[in-house]
């Protein structure tokens, strides 16, 4: 028991070796690519892959399957989290460490899973990171400009809950009864001001600010600074007391603001799982910059399950190389940091829905993080 615990701790604290010989229980590493080709969750199978582009990996992710509360009585199910950080990895790491724990606590209080449980978990996580920023502001003020998108899926009792802030995306592959064709259905709402309806929402929330969204270098940005309108963190755009010196000038807004510019409130939807619902693709926007929803669904539908997340990542990288008129083999040689000029960090989790298991109560517990590691808690 003790040796098993030590192995798990070791896997959590240090990345897998680049040789790819690491235990498959925590995934394998191949250069900047980490992958868990195949595993079992409570209601089916899953595949997971992450490729790093930033100097420090800003994408964090997790799959948890088994008890979704602190109670032995449950509820039981599967939790998927994709946390695409920006400005640094601190917020996405914080979310990875705290959101699921908050969800378990609130699910225990209500003895069930619900939209309210998920909303409270987001609120507690946002409040927790605000506490980190408040504490570190005197010595590390730039942490006020670090944030993360946060996409969550919860499968529980035959229901699927999708919650999101930011522009990561969850897509369902559903078989059409008449033809058997598997079509892509986007389940998550995105909060990126490149979308006209999101720009309109920002204008309606801030009618007195004609510069709430600005076109800068041909890209729409909130206050000319950030593309997303909702996030965890980014406290410098939520509380005016963190938008001043000693924060870097590039993050500071000239005119004071009285209400938050960005929101941390998730859009949450409920979906009753149907027999024709075949699989779910959860991914950070690094994937969706390279392929459409239907292209991703077609790839998953037409290839073996084993290694399918890694295949999606590889095809996204091939597309990124093609856009830059270079060979995929040459792209793979580019080091982290420099690689960010060619593509973003990419995280993909594919969850297969075996409907005969969807309403099952218990199963073997699973807990895995993208990259096969966490980091020593410094915040």
Curated annotation (Swiss-Prot):
| Cofactor, free-text remark | Binds 2 magnesium or manganese ions per subunit.
PTM Phosphoserine: at which residues? 73
Give GO terms: molecular function aspect only: metal ion binding; protein serine/threonine phosphatase activity
For the ligand (Mn(2+) 1), the binding residues are 84-85
Positions binding Mn(2+) 2 in this chain are 84, 285, 344
CDD domains for the chain:
PP2Cc (cd00143)
Keywords annotated in UniProt: Hydrolase, Magnesium, Manganese, Metal-binding, Phosphoprotein, Protein phosphatase, Signal
Q: Which family does it belong to?
A: Belongs to the PP2C family.
Name this polypeptide is given: Probable protein phosphatase 2C 46
Biological source species: Arabidopsis thaliana (Mouse-ear cress)
